[in-house]
Regions:
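Generic signature of intrinsically disordered, low-complexity segments enriched in small/polar residues
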Residues: 7, 62-65, 71, 94, ...
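Canonical phosphoinositide-binding patch of PH/PH-like domains
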Residues: 86-103
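Anionic N-terminal interaction surfaces
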Residues: 1-36, 98
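Terminal and domain-flanking low-complexity segments
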Residues: 98-114
């Protein structure tokens, strides 16, 4: 499981039932509230709100992502974040401080720039 060391920060078992034929988990990372899974076909995560009981599964094929932005850890913000831009919405995801965002950037570039 996982080509990148960022995958060691979370367990991907909860994503395995969601995979389609031929899909493989590349990396699973901890988000501030939940987890995110990068596969060879798409990104899967749960769009949770901190004080909401609603949990929405988001399946985002790489081909629907128009761009992304990464904010690294800084003195005033201990968490890194990733913004995924689609034609209809921007998904802002907050990662825990131990996530290697350079590896996330490399993974996204691999599928978005191919």
């Amino acid at each position: 499981l996982g080509v990148f060391s960022a995958s060691k920060t979370a367990d991907g078992k909860k994503f395995e039932p969601l995979l389609i034929e031929g899909e493989k988990i590349e990396s699973v990372c901890r988000l501030r509230i939940d987890q995110i899974c990068f596969t060879n076909k798409r990104i899967i995560f749960f769009d949770n709100k901190l004080f909401s009981k609603k949990k929405v599964r988001v399946f985002l094929p790489y081909k629907s992502i128009e761009g992304f932005a990464i904010r690294e850890v800084s003195m005033f913000n201990p968490d890194s974040s990733l913004s995924l831009m689609t034609s209809s919405k921007v998904f802002d995801l907050e990662f825990t401080k131990d996530t290697d965002m350079l590896e996330i950037q490399a993974l996204l570039s691999k599928y978005l720039c191919a």
